[in-house]
Amino acid sequence: MSKVLLGDVAVEHKETCKGSKDGYPIVGLEHLIPEEITLTAWNEGSENTFSKMFRKGNVLFGRRRAYLKKAAVAPFDGICSGDITVIEAKPDRILPELLPFMIQNDDLFEFAVGKSAGSLSPRVKWEHLKNYEFELPDMGKQKELAELLWAMDNTKKSYQKLIAATDELVKSQFFGSLKRKGSHLIHVV
């Protein structure tokens, strides 16, 4: 393992949409879910002032109010808010599949909060984020680690789906039993 700076293994992706935004998914800070590594929400309309482009595999880092711990990997190309820093892996230095996990961690967010400026809506700049230092294994270990972390994330998501389905089943059974006992109870609920 060797110590590296984030700026040694990743760059800020700076690309702007110069033409029509039609067909591009739009991602705002509200679409980044705290402590979730995958992006699951976005808008489809082009009615906004955003012009910052991101590419599939880039990490979208919520630079405003970093204490909210918002960072997710992009599953597609799109356009995002200026309050999102788009981070791209240097594939010869870090496995792109591992980068989201190196960014979505408490130590980096603590570092980001410490470097943020502003009182009502503190923001951190890439110029500061790139100086975040962390341990990085060789490429072989990075591959093993990325596979393990993605498997864990997929397992977590499967459990979340199971819990949601169980919750819906319990609700339907509960309301079904109320209907059988007397329809007047439904109106009270």
List the predicted regions and their residue ranges:
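Non-catalytic DNA-recognition/assembly elements of restriction-modification systems
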Residues: 1-17, 131-146, 154, 162-189
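Sequence-specific dsDNA recognition surfaces
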Residues: 4-17, 22-56, 189
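A short glycine-rich beta-alpha junction/loop motif
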Residues: 64, 78-85, 117-140
